Amino acid sequence: MLFWVLGLLILCGFLWTRKGKLKIEDITDKYIFITGCDSGFGNLAARTFDKKGFHVIAACLTESGSTALKAETSERLRTVLLDVTDPENVKRTAQWVKNQVGEKGLWGLINNAGVPGVLAPTDWLTLEDYREPIEVNLFGLISVTLNMLPLVKKAQGRVINVSSVGGRLAIVGGGYTPSKYAVEGFNDSLRRDMKAFGVHVSCIEPGLFKTNLADPVKVIEKKLAIWEQLSPDIKQQYGEGYIEKSLDKLKGNKSYVNMDLSPVVECMDHALTSLFPKTHYAAGKDAKIFWIPLSHMPAALQDFLLLKQKAELANPKAV
């Protein structure tokens, strides 16, 4: 009996693996739209999918980002300047994309644009500190999706939302984590709403990667700027050396940071080209081995492990 059970499990594993490797036949007639292509995941994705033969429409925030990307890609790739927080800009871009793709529609929408905002303890922050990452990471993503969705439905294509392990675990204070938690919720409701239309919706949850988004120097600079504005009471609670201790903790976590961005793009590739795309992708060894498993653990264990990564306060009772 045990032999048959093991045999059945092995067969199921083989068929599941085989299923994941089945690909769409032709990509050379398919259009994809990617946001946040100035640098990082979006830039690498645009270059990678251009080489594969997709008709890539890459949205950049800056003219310099657009120019640099066009210099590294084929004439087939198109760029457009896009601020995802500007509703009129998004509407104009969607109309322009509609004219580009014609009756083929849009096979892939990759919502990648994002910002970290201020990553600092909650009691250091104001409502405005929360606003920027939520405007870009959540409302910007929703705005682009709503405007591009008719084109994706026409092609019975794919929507790929780049979230984060920060959408599964509250690793840091600030607006980044709430924005990514909300992206996860939007992604799941969209996936169920689009199923009847033959549109597949996937969510990618990268771990810690070395990108402009996670530049520790910029993180510390923003913390220092906020520190200067804090009340004497809060400064006393945290202590003058708190930021330096936080920096030491960041340096100690370098081993967790993925230097190679390609795992995220590989997830995008599978979500775009597989006949059976996954609903969720964990990108990076740290995401697969630590962050995602931890997100399923009891809150007490999460708190214990995550609090060990935080710098100690000088005098938390000074309130």
From Swiss-Prot:
Query: Which keywords describe this protein according to UniProt?
Result: Endoplasmic reticulum, Lipid metabolism, Membrane, Microsome, NAD, NADP, Oxidoreductase, Signal, Steroid metabolism
Residues recorded as binding NAD(+), renumbered to this chain, are 34-58, 83, 180
Top-rank EC class of the record's enzyme: oxidoreductase
* Predominant location: membrane
What is the stated purpose of this protein? 3-alpha-hydroxysteroid dehydrogenase that converts 3-alpha-tetrahydroprogesterone (allopregnanolone) to dihydroxyprogesterone and 3-alpha-androstanediol to dihydroxyprogesterone. Also plays a role in the biosynthesis of retinoic acid from retinaldehyde. Can utilize both NADH and NADPH.
Instruction: Please give the Pfam families that the UniProt record associates with this protein.
Output: adh_short
The protein's GO terms of the molecular function aspect are:
alcohol dehydrogenase (NAD+) activity; all-trans-retinol dehydrogenase (NAD+) activity; androstan-3-alpha,17-beta-diol dehydrogenase (NAD+) activity; androsterone dehydrogenase [NAD(P)+] activity; oxidoreductase activity; racemase and epimerase activity; testosterone dehydrogenase (NAD+) activity
Q: What is its EC number?
A: 1.1.1.209, 1.1.1.53, 1.1.1.105
The protein here is known as: Dehydrogenase/reductase SDR family member 9
Give the signal peptide, or none: 1-17
Catalysed reaction(s) here are: 3beta-hydroxy-5alpha-pregnane-20-one + NAD(+) = 5alpha-pregnane-3,20-dione + NADH + H(+); 17beta-hydroxy-5alpha-androstan-3-one + NAD(+) = 5alpha-androstan-3,17-dione + NADH + H(+); androsterone + NAD(+) = 5alpha-androstan-3,17-dione + NADH + H(+); 5alpha-androstane-3alpha,17beta-diol + NAD(+) = 17beta-hydroxy-5alpha-androstan-3-one + NADH + H(+)
Enzyme active site: 176 (proton acceptor)
Q: Which compartments does it reside in?
A: Microsome membrane; Endoplasmic reticulum membrane
Subunit description: Homotetramer.
Q: Which organism is it from?
A: Homo sapiens
Q: Which residues bind substrate?
A: 164
Which biological processes are named by the entry's GO terms? 9-cis-retinoic acid biosynthetic process; androgen metabolic process; epithelial cell differentiation; progesterone metabolic process; retinol metabolic process; steroid metabolic process
- Coiled-coil residues: none
